[in-house]
């Protein structure tokens, strides 16, 4: 699981905090930057497959094979939280100039028989549930 309180807290946690607080989530730029999001359970599944496979000294890309823009990601997160908040756009920063990311998992499919199983929406539902349970526990 990701660090929810650190300096480099992921955007999804920041957005969940906005949803919890009823504040419009921030998107820097137009939200067109894409990433390949993969749920932690699929990462664990890939690690177990690598441990059990008859391969050594190999590295693998693991992803969901789906390019998702930050705008789309926020739309899914708002949907699974039944939120009507709208994003607030700010000027894009230049911290991360890579505009598109998509994992090529063909090697993992071939050598590990790995295929991701958790959809983006399912992963966002599980992240939301986990995070709100976590902050409830730490608040007590």
Spell out what each predicted region is.
Residues 1-13, 23-24, 28, 32, ...:
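Glycine/proline-rich active-site loop of Rossmann-fold NAD(P)-dependent oxidoreductases
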Residues 19-20, 77, 81:
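Hydrophobic aliphatic residues
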Residues 47-51, 74-77, 124-131:
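Hydrophobic "lid"/C-terminal helical patch
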């Amino acid at each position: 699981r990701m660090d929810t309180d650190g300096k480099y807290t992921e955007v999804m946690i920041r957005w969940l905090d906005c949803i919890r607080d009823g504040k419009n989530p921030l998107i820097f730029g137009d939200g067109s930057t894409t990433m390949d999001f993969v749920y932690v359970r699929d990462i664990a599944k890939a690690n177990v497959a690598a441990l059990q496979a008859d391969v050594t000294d190999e590295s693998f890309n693991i992803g969901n094979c789906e390019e998702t823009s930050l705008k789309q990601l926020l739309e899914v997160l708002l949907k699974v939280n039944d939120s009507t908040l709208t994003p607030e756009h700010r000027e894009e920063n230049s911290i991360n100039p890579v505009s598109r990311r998509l994992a090529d998992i063909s090697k993992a499919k071939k050598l590990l028989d790995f295929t991701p199983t958790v959809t983006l929406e399912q992963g966002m539902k599980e992240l939301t549930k986990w995070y709100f349970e976590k902050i409830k526990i730490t608040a007590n």
